[in-house]
Amino acid sequence: MAQKIQAIRGMNDYLPADTRVWQKIENTLKQILAGYGFSEIRTPIVEHTPLFQRAIGEVTDVVEKEMYTFTDRGEDAQSLTLRPENTAGCVRAGIEHGLLYNQEQRLWYLGPMFRYERPQKGRYRQFHQLGAEVFGLQGPDIDAELIMLTARWWKALGIAEHVTLELNSIGSLEARAKYREALVAFLEQHVDQLDEDCKRRMYSNPLRVLDSKNPEIQTLLNDAPELFDYLDDESREHFDGLCALLDAVGITYRVNQRLVRGLDYYNRTVFEWVTSALGSQGTVCAGGRYDGLVKQLGGHPTPAVGFAMGMERMILLVQAVNPEFVADTHVADVYLASFGDNSQSAALMLAEEIRDQLPTLRLMTNHGKGNFKKQLGRADKHGAKIALILGEDEINAGTVAVKDLRSGEQTIVSRSELAQQLTLLLG
């Protein structure tokens, strides 16, 4: 027997029982996005490597350790990367196709991303993100509306009581530069207390030290200078405006001054929705403002704000805290059973007639042999509520036997009345 080939570690198959849950959650989220005026954008999963180096930052963990990068074939031999996130791709597409200059755009995307990480529950090497990006608006009101949108998601999924909003402002580029100097000076005074990861980041990306998961580092940081003390007036006013809007609509939040996010393009507002229901993988949705990224990637200066949510982690959370959120496991509403030498072609023709009249009906026809009991067993297995029975007698008479599998009642109807009868029985 030939050796079996398995999926790559950290890259998962999603089988029909899984995808039904995915589809139900995706449809819920997409409907809410449409209600806020968002349109879908689809970008390639492979981009030129410099896009992510310039957007995310050369000294971030994503660029240094986690990207899947390879050299393309051909004479050009360009460096390409499987996308680790899609904000950069959206910005690249917006600039390339002229969507952003002097325009307001509200875009959403859904698709696979790739990062080389240690696989664990809720963290995979291929994972899926649903994200939303808004271009052309710079006030705190759009930041607030994006957060309101996500809060509406949580209510629709039945998880609102299990997520907490954390907020921070990381200010302008100039404010962060001043704070960076103060933070590095503090870290230099305590370098003997830093772990190796923080020592590595101390000069290359010191704000990420604030994000350390090491409890001893977090204790040390209690005495560190605070970013809020270095905020410029505009950033402080923006953040105060955002908090006031969230207070007005009743969205509770916690200001977390150590929340900095792992990507270099953020400025001013950053936020995360976190949960304690998934162990160490606590962040389910995160985002913020990135007003300088469009210019940085070659476009005109354009304010922007957005977020992304990991679908795998969200699905784990929904399944953990809201068992009533169940996807429909039935694949058929109606099952067409047929008997007799000439019944197969007649059954296929009848099925197509029904689909023409009732295009949203889920109809399965029996294929292969099987007596009456066996075919009704297949109907039940597929979750059908109605069985249509077509034999030689029904074919000759131009009728169909309709059996309600819930009540057991069976009636004979003409083919011309069949669609109306099915509509009546299925509500």
From Swiss-Prot:
It is an enzyme of class 6 (ligase). It is found in: Cytoplasm. Belongs to the class-II aminoacyl-tRNA synthetase family. The gene is hisS. The lineage of its organism: Bacteria, Pseudomonadati, Pseudomonadota, Gammaproteobacteria, Enterobacterales. GO terms for cellular component: cytoplasm. It comes from Proteus mirabilis (strain HI4320). Signal peptide: none annotated. This is Histidine--tRNA ligase. Coiled coil: none annotated. Its EC number is 6.1.1.21. GO terms for molecular function: ATP binding; histidine-tRNA ligase activity.
